[in-house]
Regions:
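AMP-dependent adenylate-forming
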Residues: 18-45, 174-177, 184, 333
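Structural core segment of the AMP-binding/adenylate-forming
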Residues: 90-161, 272-273, 278
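Conserved AMP-binding/adenylate-forming
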Residues: 297-299, 306-331, 335-396
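Conserved AMP-binding/adenylate-forming core of the ANL superfamily
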Residues: 32-69, 73-86, 103-114, 158, ...
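Conserved pre-ATP/AMP-binding loop-to-beta segment of ANL
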Residues: 27-30, 150-151, 158-179, 185-186, ...
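A short helix-loop-beta submotif of the ANL/AMP-binding
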Residues: 78-103, 115-124, 214-215, 233-243, ...
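Adenylate-forming
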Residues: 124-134, 151-156, 249, 264-316, ...
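Conserved AMP-binding/adenylation subdomain of ANL enzymes
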Residues: 198-215, 222-267, 282-287
Length: 396
């Protein structure tokens, strides 16, 4: 019987099941296209090609009896990471995505990398042949790197796909260890299961009102929870195309992000608050004349403090390009909740009035579906002559 994938969480319990189904039912549909410099189209992956690569990498991992083990994923921006990530899932291996070491200034990235290796105890490193050859010079500075098995997945042949065996993972099987930044303490690994990914993906689809016809453009790094879930998991979950560009391509020329949205008629794209501020400051009036942002339905803003002034400036600046303020979806998320915790659109102008004497009472918050409350929030505000509200999240 043909499955109805309007809501995949009803039909499937793992990401492996979803991708396998799409490879059978939508074999030639392109799911990922890589924009090499943020502009020119490079490689792409159909569901069949992604499934084949995932089975090949999965079979290689199975040959080393890595099922249940942790694997570091050290990749540059590109499609190799996506194939390796799903390859881990196909082998029952827990993926641990991290940015590759900074070879020019190893002291900037090695401490965090070594701390995570010590905590996660990975047995395998998946990477590209280029990164492998360049990283060998760091083995003397970090001996633990040499103790792991390094596999260059860009050398894996498609013939291995025939040797793959279904790992029989379930919704409770761990898919990922998502590590925190480690800016204030040692990085901590958040355990995320297949079920966690599916439930959060279903919630994202409800909050953003996504449909299979939605089109994604992203420049967010895949090792970040927002980039991984919105840029890689969501396209497979909902069966929609995604166009990816290197983060550095956006940072060097922010216009590339909006040009891609305009060119591919993207309906969903976003990033941290600074990305919108960067576009407002760096994109010229002449460049704006070439943009059509009327297709952009969901412009999510999260991963750092969301500033109303930034959104107002962006909306005003790009109104002539067809951008609608109602497209903004401010959101709050964290790795401990897979990604999205709360969010919504700005479809209606809203205002609030407060009685100052009541602001010291605990505010009442409604959690997202299937979210377990572990504490509460307190709202704190200070009277001032300009419309301004500060909020403090306090754990007790």
């Amino acid at each position: 019987m043909k499955k109805d994938l309007t809501d995949p969480i009803v039909e499937f319990s793992t990401l492996v099941e979803i991708l396998r189904w799409r490879a059978l039912q939508q074999p030639e549909q392109r799911t990922y296209t890589y924009l090499v410099d943020g502009e020119a189209e490079g490689d792409n992956l159909t569901y069949t090609a992604l499934d084949c690569q995932a089975r090949s990498i999965g079979a290689l991992l199975q040959s080393y009896r890595a099922s249940g083990e942790r694997a570091l994923l050290l990749y540059p921006a590109g499609l190799e990471f996506i194939a390796a990530f799903f390859g881990c899932l196909y082998a029952g291996v827990i993926a641990v995505p991290l940015p590759p070491p900074n070879l020019a200034q190893p002291q900037r990235t090695l401490p965090r990398l070594r701390a995570i290796i010590g905590d996660a105890q990975p047995s395998v490193v998946l990477t590209t042949s280029a990164i492998l050859s360049n990283t060998e010079g760091l083995f003397t500075q970090a001996p633990e790197l040499q103790k792991m098995r390094w596999l260059a997945t860009d050398k894996v042949t498609g013939s291995l796909a025939q040797e793959w065996r279904d790992p029989a993972v379930t919704s409770n099987t761990l898919a990922l260890l998502q590590y925190t930044s480690g800016s204030t303490a040692e990085p901590k690994g958040v355990m995320i299961s297949h079920g966690n990914f599916l439930h959060n993906s279903a919630y994202i689809n409800r909050v953003f009102a996504l449909i299979p016809a939605s089109v994604t453009v992203t420049w967010l790094p895949a090792f970040h929870d927002m980039g991984l879930t919105n840029g890689i998991i969501q396209p497979v979950y909902k069966g929609r195309p995604c166009y990816l560009m290197p983060p550095v391509s956006f940072l060097m020329r922010p216009i590339r992000w909006l040009q891609a949205i305009s060119r591919y008629k993207a309906t969903i794209s976003g990033g941290p608050n600074f990305a919108y501020d960067l576009c407002t400051r760096r994109i010229t009036p002449e460049q704006r004349e070439t943009l059509d942002l009327s297709s952009w339905d969901v412009a999510y803003n999260g991963a750092e403090p969301v500033r109303a002034d930034t959104m107002k400036r962006f909306a005003a600046t790009f109104a002539s390009c067809g951008f609608r303020p109602s497209a903004f979806h401010p959101c709050y998320g964290l790795a401990e909740a897979t990604l999205l915790v709360s969010g919504g659109s700005l479809r209606d102008e809203c205002s609030a009035r407060f009685k100052w004497q009541r602001l010291n009472r605990t505010a009442s918050w409604r959690p997202a579906p299937n979210t377990r409350m572990c504490g509460h929030l307190s709202a704190v505000a200070t009277p001032c002559t300009i419309p301004r509200l500060s909020s403090l999240i306090r754990n007790r």
